[in-house]
């Protein structure tokens, strides 16, 4: 089994790049959904790409720090319930890295399916359970509203990761395989 994270210069630098890209995309490249405080976040496609390259711990760190920095820039204090959920979603997505052959440059239909199974599970858990559950516990949010907001966030995040993440990984694997 692959390591959860390789602590070396290359992965530390790549993680920092991931945090910066995630922050910028999370803050500036999003599409409103019509539900309050829920957008189609292109950043999760970027986060998933880094999660597969760096492993689950690197992916969780990219999303956790990127979401935190974006919230601090935009609002002041971060919404910790959603920041934690971002980290969990990318941690679970990053678990797919042990099933994919990143270094060999292979990314076939089977690999796309495996990647998307992991990201769907991660997004469902993060946005349908963790974020709304923590909203209720940490902030005293109305449970119905919190879980409805979580459900509204789930599908756009699944689509964002499914499309953007799959395309980025496909391009990376093609280039890497040469």
Predicted regions and their residues:
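Membrane-embedded alpha-helical hairpins and interfacial helices in multi-pass inner-membrane proteins
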Residues: 29-41, 75-81, 104-178
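Hydrophobic transmembrane alpha-helices
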Residues: 1-53, 57-61
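Broad structural signal for hydrophobic residues in well-ordered alpha-helices, predominantly aliphatic
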Residues: 50, 69, 96, 134-135
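Generic N-terminal initiation segments characterized by hydrophobic and/or small/turn-forming residues
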Residues: 1, 22, 97, 110-111
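Short, flexible micro-motifs
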Residues: 54, 58, 62, 66-69, ...
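Structural signal for the C-terminal ends of transmembrane alpha-helices
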Residues: 53, 95-101, 170-176
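Alpha-helical transmembrane segments in multi-pass membrane proteins
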Residues: 14, 18-22, 47, 51, ...
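Interfacial aromatic-anchored transmembrane helix boundaries in multi-pass membrane proteins
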Residues: 23-39, 64-97, 148
